[in-house]
């Protein structure tokens, strides 16, 4: 298993810890929002022109999404900007103060059980500009939950949805967007790629990923004090009051130029001869025991001239060019198509690194390599005299004819 895959497993554990601790809501930095929106604008300067943008799960007191779109309202050519926020009583703590303070100054008692709607569509102050100062707000009838009828109406009015939803609600939130057929850009965890509700959309080229985050980790502001003892927040990851969240990606259906840049790859022969990876150099590519595909442990080791199916790490999707490769499926239980499997296994003996043996059925969870001898220092599986190693989840791809090699 590669270092990247070990990190992915660590990311998964960390995310699960965060969900259990109810700490999966983070506020995105302005620079990260700007970088991603610029990618769309570089590809198409009119990405947002004449459109209504909805920012659900958003609170202008904390979130930079509203600030970015409000400050760039004219430059983007927006028609209307709508933000909604949850009611304080619907959240774990009462985060916002700015707009509640305005309500108190007007003699209106803050309504903690109701969410808010913020709208920007014209110059309110009369200074000749349309910006953050022109935002008008009022209370919603309900608590601001995106699943409510009134927020659904706002979704239906909008052309584009942009936000960073709580990771624990990612599947439901994405389905909520797709149901309405809207353009969108949302932040989620990379592990969502293999969700059975998400992968078919990626395979069908209805949504794709972008990864402008350095080393795949984003730094976010948390609305509550975070216990840095949690594995999700290692002390060396804490930066100026920001939390490092690993494995985050943008999920979108907005076009950007990066996804049309083909990977520069070597032929199979050159990879075997020159690859920088010891798993490939001088060894070649092994075939799975349970899929009609070869194992490619690194994206930069994909052979440019192989016409069959290849299993590649899920991080491949960060650099996936639909003009160069076709996604065939995913080798992972739950999300994958069982018809792609060529073998199903009975119970097997799992031999841990320390030699402990356990009866399991894990080999049916993903791609499997059959080996001649037990690997030294690695976990493996036995079925009779056969010895196997399990590979982490893989995206199954094949190259398109006439692609750029």
Ranges and model annotations:
Residues 2-162, 166-405:
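Class I S-adenosyl-L-methionine-dependent methyltransferase catalytic core
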């Amino acid at each position: 298993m590669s270092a990247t895959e070990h990190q992915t497993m660590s990311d998964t554990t960390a995310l699960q810890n965060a969900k259990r601790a109810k700490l999966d809501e983070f506020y995105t930095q302005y620079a990260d929002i700007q970088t991603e929106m610029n990618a769309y604008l570089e590809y198409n300067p009119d990405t947002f022109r004449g459109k209504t943008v909805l920012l659900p799960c958003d609170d202008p007191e904390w979130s930079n999404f509203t600030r970015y779109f409000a400050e760039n309202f004219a430059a983007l050519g927006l028609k209307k900007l709508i933000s909604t926020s949850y009611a304080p009583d619907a959240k774990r703590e009462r985060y916002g103060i700015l707009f509640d303070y305005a309500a108190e100054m007007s003699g209106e008692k803050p309504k903690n059980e109701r969410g808010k709607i913020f709208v920007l569509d014209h110059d309110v102050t009369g200074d000749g500009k349309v910006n953050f100062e022109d935002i008008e707000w009022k209370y919603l009838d309900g608590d601001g939950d995106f699943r409510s009828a009134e927020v659904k109406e706002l979704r239906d009015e909008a052309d584009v949805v942009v936000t960073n939803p709580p990771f624990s609600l990612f599947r439901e939130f994405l389905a909520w967007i797709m149901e309405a057929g809207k353009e969108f850009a949302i932040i989620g965890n990379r592990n969502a790629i293999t969700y059975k509700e998400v992968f078919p959309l990626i395979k069908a080229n209805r949504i794709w990923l972008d990864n402008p985050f350095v080393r795949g980790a984003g730094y976010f502001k948390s609305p509550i004090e975070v216990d840095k003892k949690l594995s999700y927040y290692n002390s060396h990851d804490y930066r100026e009051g920001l939390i490092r969240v690993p494995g985050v990606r943008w999920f979108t259906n907005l076009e950007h130029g990066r996804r049309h840049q083909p990977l520069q790859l070597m032929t199979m022969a050159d990879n075997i001869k020159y690859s920088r990876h010891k798993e490939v150099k001088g060894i070649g590519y092994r075939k799975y025991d349970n899929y009609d595909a070869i194992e490619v442990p690194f994206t930069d080791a994909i052979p440019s001239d192989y016409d069959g199916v290849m299993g590649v790490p899920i991080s491949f999707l960060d650099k996936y060019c639909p003009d160069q490769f076709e996604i065939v499926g995913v080798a992972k239980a739950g999300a994958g198509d069982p018809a792609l499997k060529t073998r199903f296994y009975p119970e097997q003996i799992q031999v841990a690194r320390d030699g402990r043996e356990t009866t399991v059925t894990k080999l049916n969870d993903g791609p499997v390599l059959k080996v001649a001898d037990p690997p030294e220092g690695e976990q493996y599986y036995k079925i009779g005299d056969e010895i196997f190693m399990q590979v982490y989840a893989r995206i199954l791809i094949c190259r398109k004819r006439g692609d750029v090699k």
